[in-house]
Amino acid sequence: MTWWEALLLGLIQGLTEFIPVSSSGHLVLGQYLLGLDKEAADVTFEVFVHFGTVLSILTVYWDDVAELVEEAWAGLRAPRAVPTRFAENDTFRLGVFILVTLVPTGVAYVLFREPLEQAFGSPRFTSAMLVGTGVLLLLTRIGPRPDGDLSGVKAFVVGVAQSCALVPGISRSGATICTALYQNVAPERAANFSFLMLLPVVLGGTVLKGLELMEQGVGAAGLSLGIGTVAAYGSGIGAIYVVLDVVRRGNLQYFAYYCFLIGGLGLWLL
């Protein structure tokens, strides 16, 4: 992988991890169009660019993450007070909701890991799923503006949506934000929850891929990996702020049009 290919794919990863247009879908299509060997690119490169997106979340949400860790530690130190903390502390409750989303996502990954990995080899299937993401985004225009809060049930349903986004072409941020909005969760709350709940998922995936990488060895040049990581980090920070602004304004349909365009072109040309 050349440095400019690493730069391009790093930018794609950072932008599309948070902008609701499917990072996995764009990496599949990008690697296909660049003629990269998927087996060599995925294991090595994805570990590093996902680390870049982890740093993006930590940079933007450092105060929130620090509070979540503090509340989790307090809960572990005083388990008998957990019900009270859950009822009275918004941050502690948010942490519990994030844990709830991991249940359906983890189950889906364990049960369907093999077919999911096979799906990453089909650019046409990925293109079709991008069109599906566009439909999800467009449906947010229906109905009144949401103004509610999260609950345990809503968080679980959002987790189910996140598990569906394991399929390449289905945007994780798009599926989770839209599902929260469909359940009358206020837009900014929905977007912030979507980004915070991504952190343990990406960390877990990075660790698993990292272990695989240790067995296989680094397949790409160190310079290219560094460039890709920095590109993913910088573009990821910008993408988070862009999405927060778009969600506040209720304009997710613009991303839907983009998904229709890219997905349609993929179905036509690939």
UniProtKB/Swiss-Prot annotation:
It is a multi-pass membrane protein. GO terms for molecular function: undecaprenyl-diphosphatase activity. It is an enzyme of class 3 (hydrolase). Pfam families: BacA (PF02673). InterPro entries: UppP. It is found in: Cell inner membrane. Keywords: Antibiotic resistance, Cell inner membrane, Cell membrane, Cell shape, Cell wall biogenesis/degradation, Hydrolase, Membrane, Peptidoglycan synthesis, Transmembrane, Transmembrane helix. It catalyses: di-trans,octa-cis-undecaprenyl diphosphate + H2O = di-trans,octa-cis-undecaprenyl phosphate + phosphate + H(+). Its EC number is 3.6.1.27. The chain crosses the membrane at residues 1-21, 92-112, 119-139, 150-170, 193-213, 223-243, 250-270. GO terms for biological process: cell wall organization; peptidoglycan biosynthetic process; regulation of cell shape; response to antibiotic. GO terms for cellular component: plasma membrane. Bacitracin is thought to be involved in the inhibition of peptidoglycan synthesis by sequestering undecaprenyl diphosphate, thereby reducing the pool of lipid carrier available. Catalyzes the dephosphorylation of undecaprenyl diphosphate (UPP). Confers resistance to bacitracin. Belongs to the UppP family. This is Undecaprenyl-diphosphatase. It comes from Salinibacter ruber (strain DSM 13855 / M31). The lineage of its organism: Bacteria, Pseudomonadati, Rhodothermota, Rhodothermia, Rhodothermales.
